[in-house]
Amino acid sequence: MAAKKVFGSAEASNLVTELRRSFDDGVTRGYEWRVTQLKKLMIICDNHEPEIVAALRDDLGKPELESSVYEVSLLRNSIKLALKQLKNWMAPEKAKTSLTTFPASAEIVSEPLGVVLVISAWNYPFLLSIDPVIGAISAGNAVVLKPSELAPASSALLTKLLEQYLDPSAVRVVEGAVTETSALLEQKWDKIFYTGSSKIGRVIMAAAAKHLTPVVLELGGKSPVVVDSDTDLKVTVRRIIVGKWGCNNGQACVSPDYILTTKEYAPKLIDAMKLELEKFYGKNPIESKDMSRIVNSNHFDRLSKLLDEKEVSDKIVYGGEKDRENLKIAPTILLDVPLDSLIMSEEIFGPLLPILTLNNLEESFDVIRSRPKPLAAYLFTHNKKLKERFAATVSAGGIVVNDIAVHLALHTLPFGGVGESGMGAYHGKFSFDAFSHKKAVLYRSLFGDSAVRYPPYSRGKLRLLKALVDSNIFDLFKVLLGLA
């Protein structure tokens, strides 16, 4: 067996130097280069979907539907949009000028940042790797992708496919774990895009600060679901289930983390959830082929610890079965766990779902407000005033009313966090903007130069300049006519 190549600080430095040379030579800036790379990404999606599905099955036990729809199809949509809109995105945006600069014209130019680093996550290893790369390439950057070592089959396939199809002078993949990531983070980048936990997000931000490198941090948090009694119970329950257990078995950054409802309504909600869960996954959901497994034994043990805590284990009202050998945990519903328990203190990122009961739904706003701002917040209700208040007053990366997680499929909406759930946003044109510098450009004429801005200064010049800067045409005429 060949020895694994060492990738340390020297190798990372050489890599960045090579890519920066390509960027400085203008390799990535042209429209044709960008389009060519995007089309090759589409070929990867079209020609290698079975391999992608197989890799996701190896890494996470994902069912084919989840892999094809939530990873490959979403990537196709992102690529199609970029190919369709790229000329418009690249075109300078006209900007208004003022009396102060007359005669002049102005525009905002989207300029590529340079050499960027994308560090992706294991839970959606293709979507969360390639989607930011689409934005980086569309914006004209050279890019290094560091996929997650926790999804080894996906990481290996990503490396193989991107090396096979994309321009190696400007797009590279670095596999590895902490050593390789640390070596990459020592380098000076023009932007770092990270998807993962807030714990590692802090490490990324600290490393970026040394070089004043801007970052996009796509993190997570405890995304709440508020369920009003004035709702369609069956539809509500089905959407919560598919948004929780039907999205990588709860291992998703926008997964429902806990439910808030009233004490009176909770029994109906729980009974309905039990009924639909059995319809979806059978009497023994651990054996269901339609549910992903836990990514590895470390995460399995972490989730088991949340579930086995003394004040929590007796709160299970559904599920709780575990199979460590096959890394399976059944969908588990818990009722009224303590607010200071581990399960309510950290992001769950798995198939456990606490339900907290309240005297009235008004209290849900206080519970959400008392915690760090989540990546997503969800509400199920027919009540128009409640919808409006929730959208207006709950601070989260995104709000969805009467569904779960579907907002991330809309390229017209920015996807990103706020506060501890992240910073920056992407998807659609927001991805292009995330990897662009919006450069202000002003064109002035050398004709019609006025002495009013030059010394020696006078009261008349002061009045005239104030009128110009204020863009007050009436005052300007008064000054010119000697009336002011």
Swiss-Prot record:
Belongs to the aldehyde dehydrogenase family. Optimum pH is 8.0. It comes from Arabidopsis thaliana (Mouse-ear cress). The active site is at E218, C253. Isoform alpha is expressed in expanded leaves and flowers. Detected in seedlings. Isoform beta is mainly expressed in flowers. Detected in leaves and seedlings. Homodimer and homomultimer. This is Aldehyde dehydrogenase family 3 member H1. It catalyses: an aldehyde + NAD(+) + H2O = a carboxylate + NADH + 2 H(+). Disruption phenotype: Increased sensitivity to salt stress. GO terms for biological process: aldehyde metabolic process; response to abscisic acid; response to desiccation; response to salt stress. Its EC number is 1.2.1.3. Thiol-based regulation. Inactivation after dimerization under oxidizing conditions. The record marks N123 as: Transition state stabilizer. Involved in oxidative stress tolerance by detoxifying reactive aldehydes derived from lipid peroxidation. Medium- to long-chain saturated aldehydes are preferred substrates, while the short-chain aldehyde propanal is a weak substrate. Is strictely NAD(+) specific. InterPro entries: Ald_DH/histidinol_DH, Ald_DH_C, Ald_DH_CS_GLU, Ald_DH_N, Aldehyde_DH_dom, Aldehyde_DH_NAD(P). Induction: By abscisic acid (ABA), dehydration and salt stress in roots. Isoform alpha is up-regulated in leaves but not in roots upon salt treatment. Isoforn beta is up-regulated by salt treatment in both roots and leaves. It is an enzyme of class 1 (oxidoreductase). One of its GO terms (cellular component) is plasmodesma. NAD(+) binds at G196, S197, S198, K199, I200, G201. Keywords: Disulfide bond, NAD, Oxidoreductase, Stress response. One of its GO terms (molecular function) is aldehyde dehydrogenase (NAD+) activity. Pfam families: Aldedh.
